[in-house]
């Protein structure tokens, strides 16, 4: 049986990573909206549905950014 070393949970850059993820998701929404005029009706519906899910993800990531920033401020992330 092999022994695995436990790596400490380094969350020091979570806020920055989440901010990058939000920005990338926003860019994906913008790019997909540019493609709407070239898409069939079925594809347009799929794009709209996917963008709705993307917006929900953005909201969740922003909530997590807030939580991580608060934790950092309170000294949990040094």
From Swiss-Prot:
Mainly resides where? Answer: other
- What's one GO BP annotation on this UniProt entry? sporulation resulting in formation of a cellular spore
Query: Known InterPro entries for this protein?
Result: SASP_thioredoxin-like
Instruction: Please give the record's induction comment.
Output: Expressed only in the forespore compartment of sporulating cells.
Compartment(s) of residence: Spore core
- Region: Disordered; residue ranges are 32-78
Here the segments flagged for biased composition (Basic and acidic residues) are 45-78
Pfam families for the chain: Tlp (PF19824)
**Which keywords belong to this entry?**
Sporulation
Q: Which family does it belong to?
A: Belongs to the Tlp family.
What protein am I looking at? Answer: Small, acid-soluble spore protein Tlp
Q: Which organism is it from?
A: Bacillus licheniformis (strain ATCC 14580 / DSM 13 / JCM 2505 / CCUG 7422 / NBRC 12200 / NCIMB 9375 / NCTC 10341 / NRRL NRS-1264 / Gibson 46)
């Amino acid at each position: 049986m092999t022994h695995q070393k436990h790596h400490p949970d380094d969350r020091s850059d979570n806020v920055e990573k989440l901010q990058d993820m939000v920005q990338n998701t926003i860019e994906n929404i913008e790019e997909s909206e540019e493609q709407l005029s070239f898409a069939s009706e079925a594809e347009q519906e799929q794009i709209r549905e996917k963008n709705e899910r993307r917006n929900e993800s953005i909201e969740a990531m922003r909530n997590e950014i807030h939580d991580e920033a608060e934790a950092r401020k309170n000294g949990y992330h040094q």
